[in-house]
Amino acid sequence: MAGPFSRLLSARPGLRLLALAGAGSLAAGFLLRPEPIRAASERRRQYPPSAEYPDLRKHNNCMASHLTPAVYARLCDKTTPTGWTLDQCIQTGVDNPGHPFIKTVGMVAGDEETYEVFAELFDPVIQERHNGYDPRTMKHTTDLDASKIRSGFFDERYVLSSRVRTGRSIRGLSLPPACTRAERREVERVVVDALSGLKGDLAGRYYRLSEMTEAEQQQLIDDHFLFDKPVSPLLTAAGMARDWPDARGIWHNNEKSFLIWVNEEDHTRVISMEKGGNMKKVFERFCRGLKEVERLIQERGWEFMWNERLGYILTCPSNLGTGLRAGVHIKLPLLSKDSRFPKILENLRLQKRGTGGVDTAATGSIFDISNLDRLGKSEVELVQLVIDGVNYLIDCERRLERGQDIRIPPPLPNKH
């Protein structure tokens, strides 16, 4: 399997030039890796795989459900072309047995090849996390035609804000858990250079975390524009907080309605958001902006990681496919206290998070509600699922306000 530089140098002429131009800064990161990897491999050979197998008896994440001693034994000595190992994939899941709100995946990828080299473990995890999607036999579809969306205007007495986000990874550079400092800085350079070409209502500027004051950072976090500081154990155990805040930042347009995070959990997170309940408008801007970002990236000789089985490749298997999370902040004081609320969400394929995101609790009965699936359905299908599902939640809240009963909807048909 080709390594990052061989893939780069076999690509288009413009990509070869960029790869060669960046070789001086990147070579150290690639060439200095093998020695510690070989040393670790030599130490490992002193012990059988059974002696290295992690204790997962109290774990309930997806990785722990599928990693058997036999699978571990077959995969533990394999590495990707950049030296990423199985133990590095699973460390975050070993260190974090479970989560109070959602069942986490418990593993990450270090590069694009991770999903192939360790497919024996990743494929069943992907199948569990993505509602039965089988990456060995199925193909993912992409659809960024926002004109297909029906309705998409929520009652703003309940929906406070609407947001659509995705992630994209730059092909040929390691993902955040594995990247060197040089690679991370190269991601920032490539992305920021491309974003400088955005025009019209998408035009904006880039802000490096290292150049912000603590107060400026916190204000952006409190306003839900910026990713939080890397305090989540899921991030730190995966190695994604290394060298913080080097080469991290946020780009946003002048209205702060179109944003790109750089080098947090993924190379990029592309976000369209605004206050209120106009999800259709948010998705239209998302599709238009994302297409333009990809065009600008390709114009400079780079491309996003993608394949027809897994869609867009990202760090966490939960974000494969579309990488899309369409969500609202919604106030549900009565429904949230109803014992049927979790089952309603489950049957609608929706996910509940706290007001501030994945590691927070709800305040004032305000929840972050979004699609559970990412892979096997297109962007249009997932946004429509959220629109229909959120409208159902609002209808339930209204019925409870009137003292009427609500019902659990039948499970959505599983169509991949």
UniProtKB/Swiss-Prot annotation:
Question: Which Gene Ontology cellular component annotation is one that this UniProt entry carries?
Answer: mitochondrion
Question: Does the entry feature the keyword Hydrolase, yes or no?
Answer: no
Q: Where is the transit peptide?
A: 1-39
Location of the Phosphagen kinase N-terminal domain: 44-131
The Phosphagen kinase C-terminal domain, residue ranges = 158-400
Subunit description: Exists as an octamer composed of four MTCK homodimers.
Protein function: Reversibly catalyzes the transfer of phosphate between ATP and various phosphogens (e.g. creatine phosphate). Creatine kinase isoenzymes play a central role in energy transduction in tissues with large, fluctuating energy demands, such as skeletal muscle, heart, brain and spermatozoa.
- Name recorded for this polypeptide: Creatine kinase U-type, mitochondrial
Q: Which organism is it from?
A: Sus scrofa (Pig)
